[in-house]
Amino acid sequence: MLSKKLAIDHIPHLIKGKRVLMRVDFNVPIKEGKIKDLTRIQGALPSINYCLENGAESVVLMSHLGRPDGQRVEKHSLKPVLPAIEDLLKKKVQFLDDCVGSEVERECKSASKGKVILLENLRFHLAEEGKGVINGEKVKATKEDIAAFRKSLTSLGELYVNDGFGTAHRAHSSMVGVNVDTRAAGFLLKKELQYFSKILETPERPLTVVMGGAKVADKIQLIMKLLELADELIIGGGMAFTFNKVLDGSNIGKSLFDQEGAKIVPDIIKKAKERGVKIHLPVDAVAADKFEESAATQLVDLKTGAIPDGWMGLDIGPKTIEQNSRVILRAKTVFWNGPQGVFEMAPFSKGSLSMLDDIIKATQTGATSVAGGGDTVSLLGKVKGTTDKFSHVSTGGGASLELLQGKQLPGVVALSDRQ
């Protein structure tokens, strides 16, 4: 049970005078030495500040950045992140150019008076992920190297805080290998667990799930699991055309068709019927003659008409928007994963933007709304001022989807249980 795990605000009395080792997610986009999006760094601030306010001797921050595959790659150094952390924390932060080893251990052990230290990229070492690539060859870290790496990390703190939800589904050394007595979730991780446990364990009903994206096959496990939880399921985006073709035999022109996913559609419909879940598919679509913003478009009624050969469906139409709106506005819990159309192009963004508006309206009238998945989160990022109108926007694409599929997250399992 997610709610049984120890969190940082359960242990203020244990923080005083302790060296805190904190796993954060500073995997931020950097271009020409400049950070393009500060969201992840800002997200870690409440946990860092809480430790400092409660008298931590020091806070040592560790993170990965990019995929250096177990080698030191300068463009993946965390050093460019330092000025942003100092600016946001309004205090000096010491940067160490490694994350383990005798020199790092010495610096971290002697840090005092609320000092904050940022370690170099964890993934510069093979032992963080347990594998990597050297000279184009895939290599694995030895058991001895992994044990030594974890021992060195463990010595850097007396208390461990995990605030890196984005990699909690990976059994990496910084997630599962820090062997101290007290291992707690930071505020960011706690919030993620709170909202996902609400969906998984105690949802207010009706619970409506909105699925989008391209392929059915990619999300089959997720859809099957969500059919055990949901009352209503809205299917949109590219994957909807696979459902339309299989179920109605409709001509979908050059729209996305997922050959593998098509084989699974009857199983999804069967399970939905067994569980009494209402599935809502598009009844009309905006079709285009090419995959471009300047394409010619036409509205197609999917019940009576067909998408012409050579044309492709790139968004849901007004009748579907209306249908979805009714479903969303009666929901008490909404989980949104995947846009309704090609929202990056203005002529095909209406379906996704209407969905966004409806979920915000539902939230304002008391529903719990959770958004997850890269495309959905980037849509919210594009439309200013929408993120904070959701109950929760998840920071962990893969981690949140694995959690919803009923899988255990190694980074969460490794946390101490509440007494």
From Swiss-Prot:
EC number annotated for this UniProt entry: 2.7.2.3
Gene Ontology cellular-component annotations: cytosol
List of residues binding AMP: A214, K215, K219, G238, G313, E344
Keyword Transferase: yes
Signal peptide: none
SUPFAM superfamilies membership: Phosphoglycerate kinase
Protein name according to UniProt: Phosphoglycerate kinase
Annotated positions binding CDP: G213, D218, G237, G338, F343
Keyword annotations of the record: ATP-binding, Glycolysis, Kinase, Magnesium, Metal-binding, Nucleotide-binding, Transferase
PANTHER family per record: PHOSPHOGLYCERATE KINASE (PTHR11406:SF0)
